[in-house]
Regions:
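ATP-binding Walker
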Residues: 11-14
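Walker A/P-loop
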Residues: 17
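ATP-dependent small-molecule kinase phosphotransfer cores
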Residues: 29-87, 91-98, 137-141
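Short, well-ordered beta-strand core segments
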Residues: 31, 108, 160-163
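Small-molecule kinase domains that catalyze NTP-dependent phosphoryl transfer to phosphate-bearing small molecules
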Residues: 68-69, 127-174, 181
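Conserved phosphate-donor/acceptor-positioning beta-strand/loop module used by diverse small-molecule
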Residues: 89-90, 100-125
């Protein structure tokens, strides 16, 4: 079987991480996140992993090393991965897929859910320190950030869309159907 590379683009707290974790646990695939390299840098310099700091370090890297710097790193990691199933999570801008889309077996998947549902999930999970006290209005403002504005545009270019307004079982069923469409045997 040839390699299947699923690239997840999705709104904030839409379920990208949940799906990546599910696939990792069920199929033992590797997952690559654009934010991992950013968190690594922030951790190394002992700076809080807030959403604002993640966006700032991303901007600094892109401005100084090229808009495609993170895409280059991720695509090389994915290309060198020997697994039959690979997940790339956190695609946010067109340059993120510049090199990924040239890899055989790459499929862009858009994951979405209603804003209120996503805000409730974000507050509950508290992935970043600044999320636990965030109001719904602040959440909606965050979605106006540069990278978040491009997500819907990229979502329009995706091969498949997953709507995550239902149950966790429905979410898993949708990804299993997509894998079957791409010839993955479970």
């Amino acid at each position: 079987m040839s390699k299947i590379i699923l690239g997840f683009v999705g709104d904030l707290a839409s379920g990208k991480g949940t799906l990546a974790k599910y696939l990792q646990e069920k199929y033992h695939c590797n997952t690559y996140r654009f934010s991992t390299m950013l968190r690594d840098i922030l951790n190394r310099i002992y700076v809080e992993n807030s959403r604002e700091n993640l966006q700032l370090i991303s901007k600094i890297l892109r401005e100084n090393f090229g808009q495609d710097v993170m895409s280059t790193v991720i695509s090389k990691d994915v290309e060198n991965d020997k697994n039959e199933l690979v997940v790339v999570e956190g695609i946010r801008r067109p340059t993120d897929i510049t090199y990924l889309q040239n890899l055989l077996g790459f499929h862009l998947i858009y994951i979405t859910a209603e804003p209120k549902t996503r805000w409730e999930r974000m507050v509950k999970r508290q992935e970043n320190p600044d999320e636990k006290d965030k109001t719904f209005e602040q959440f909606l403002l965050d979605e106006q950030a540069e990278a978040d504005m491009l997500i819907k545009e990229l979502g329009g270019k995706a091969e498949k869309t997953i709507n995550n307004d239902g149950t966790i079982e429905e979410l898993y069923s949708q990804i299993e159907n997509i894998l079957a469409d791409y010839g993955h045997k479970n």
